[in-house]
Amino acid sequence: MSDQQQLPVYKIALGIEYDGSKYYGWQRQNEVRSVQEKLEKALSQVANEPITVFCAGRTDAGVHGTGQVVHFETTAQRKDAAWTLGVNANLPGDIAVRWVKAVPDDFHARFSATARRYRYIIYNHRLRPAVLSKGVTHFYEPLDAERMHRAAQCLLGENDFTSFRAVQCQSRTPWRNVMHINVTRHGPYVVVDIKANAFVHHMVRNIVGSLMEVGAHNQPESWIAELLAAKDRTLAAATAKAEGLYLVAVDYPDRYDLPKPPMGPLFLAD
């Protein structure tokens, strides 16, 4: 083989699950633990070359993922089992590959995505949990999930989410299109399930923080609509904690035919 002859490059997509409680977010950063850094290290070991991954959504410190999607390019030709079982063998126990799929050159985990879906899990009980303490948010006041659901429906469609946007958000626009938002109760768990084309920084956690005030009867049902119209972050409730938030699914055009495993988290039925 001549020096000029290039090896073929393969583009691979992976579905990733992780417990974010011990990580300083998804994105690789100097001197702190990140999910991206651990995944790239494991992939590089299997590929026997440096690997850089691109993700669908960069989750914050303490936030979890059951449906994160990444892609990477490599000259390494490996069987699917190497990219799943082999990579998992090199990952810490709180990160796992769920599926693998070869994708065409035009695929991008972030820019090809048409929607992202999050679930926020509230453990609504008088006493705090121990086993799932880093996987749910504890809220001791009784919550009316049906009231929260009704209040949330004003967020559907395209809206300016300035009132639910972090001050440090770097997005060029506060406008987002919410496709669905449902609030349901499953025993002691209250689940806020929201899907949108994209999210401004802390959008889900800020929405949930205000919905909990409505669910606890500290604010009227109309309050969420009033906040949305006000376009003022200072009027809304405090940001809900990170530990209850999960990135559960990312939508892509059907032509990519990516796997769609159960969304989870695993202790919840779909």
From Swiss-Prot:
Residues that hold substrate according to the record: Y118
Keyword Hydrolase: no
Xref: InterPro entries: PsdUridine_synth_cat_dom_sf (IPR020103), PsdUridine_synth_TruA (IPR001406), PsdUridine_synth_TruA_a/b_dom (IPR020097), PsdUridine_synth_TruA_C (IPR020095), TruA/RsuA/RluB/E/F_N (IPR020094)
Keyword annotations from UniProtKB, A to Z: Isomerase, tRNA processing
Enzyme class: isomerase
Region (Interaction with tRNA): 168-172
Site keyed Interaction with tRNA: positions: R58, R78, R110, R126, F139
Active site: D60
Enzyme Commission identifier(s): 5.4.99.12
Catalytic activity from the UniProt record: uridine(38/39/40) in tRNA = pseudouridine(38/39/40) in tRNA
GO biological process, one term: tRNA pseudouridine synthesis
GO MF, one example: RNA binding
Span list, region RNA binding: 107-111
Protein's UniProt keywords contain Isomerase: yes
Family: Belongs to the tRNA pseudouridine synthase TruA family.
Function of the molecule: Formation of pseudouridine at positions 38, 39 and 40 in the anticodon stem and loop of transfer RNAs.
Assembly description: Homodimer.
NCBIfam families per UniProt: hisT_truA (TIGR00071)
Protein known as: tRNA pseudouridine synthase A
